[in-house]
Amino acid sequence: MKKLVLIFALIAAAAYFVSINKNHLKVEYISIGTQPTKALEVASFDAAAKPKNIILIIGDGTGLNQITLSRIASGGPDHRLAIDQMPFFGNSLTHSYNNIYTDSAASATSWATGIKTKNKFLSITPDGKAIPEILSNKGYISGLVATSSITHATPAAFYAHIDSRYKEKEIASQLLESPIKLSLGGGLEFFDIEKVKESNLLITDMNDLDGDKFLKAKKVLGLFDEDGINRSSSKPTQLQMTKAALNWLSSKANLNSCNGFFLMSEGSQIDWASHDNDAATMVVEFKDFDQTIAMAMDFVTSNKETLLLVTADHETGGLQILSQKNDTVKVQWGTGSHTSIPVGVYAYGPGAHVFTGLMDNTDIHYMILDAIESSGLKPLVCSN
């Protein structure tokens, strides 16, 4: 009888392992890259220096192993990415209000409002204000960039207040009523286009991101795909949209004597590739993300009143980097969903030195506001 029980137990365990291995423990081999490191100029900042501007770059689903694999795939283990060259580093906890597992809505709400919420909820908090709303009467102008739809969970947390991230048509309506002046991403299908045109310059062609009409517009909504932006030569990358956004925001802030600007830019599809357990596509998406960081670091070096922060909402896929075989590395995915692994926080610019050690994702909200001394800013509407 004991032997029979043991046999059944072994069969059940084997069946369970096969099921798990088939569905979650996907193995891939990624080539080790040979690109040389591009060393970036990194300036030093006095500890007492304060920023005027904030750039927050998000790698959706980007854990430390997504970064490690991308580093190896670019130039090997000794290669250095742009993100590796940011001088200050910490770790962030990511859990939501009632679950160790977070989704993008809850995590982005933590940055946007400084308060934890339940998964799927967007910035439903006691005082209901996200960073762009807080800063809108403090002389700031704000913009958003995403390679997802601009109504997707992460960007939406910075302007929408709603009980479900999936109500994207309602979220789109809230964007039009928000203080966000520049939005670049996908999501055309969720908007009432006639209503958009009442108060925005609508852009659907990436070639219009550097024209005079774009730079002179008072409010811009760029929608470059029906939902998330498909990667192709006719569609803008995170790098291209973020560069255009920085040109627009810095120009408007200078022309209108604003106190500064706030920009959130998300590389959304690192997460999507990780959900699909597709390491090769993840590396492609990360390359765009890292090039965006490099460009933003150059901006900070040249415009020394800007603080650059880079982090992630959560890790996706439970990615593991296991071994090397000739000129490839073996990687394995543990899940098709998110994990509760802490994520990195990287900082460069005035005020960057405080973003070290272990922090909660809600802390980032308050640290941003403290960095620009928002509590001491006098009421001012930055009209462009």
Each PLM stretch: what is its role?
Residues 5-17:
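Hydrophobic membrane-insertion alpha-helices, especially the h-region
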Residues 19-187, 192, 197-213, 218, ...:
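N-terminal catalytic scaffold of extracellular/periplasmic and nuclease hydrolases
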Residues 56, 184, 222-224, 262-266, ...:
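Structural motif
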Residues 64, 289-326:
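Metal-dependent active-site segment of extracytoplasmic phospho-/sulfohydrolases and closely related
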Residues 153-158, 226-229, 245-246, 250, ...:
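Active-site His/acidic residue clusters
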Residues 203-244:
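Functional beta-strand-loop-alpha-helix junction segments that form "active/interaction loops"
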Residues 225, 265-269, 274, 286, ...:
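Active-site proximal loops enriched in glycine and acidic residues that flank catalytic Cys/His/Asp
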Residues 282-298, 330-343:
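Gly/Ser/Thr-rich active-site loops/lids in small-molecule metabolic enzymes
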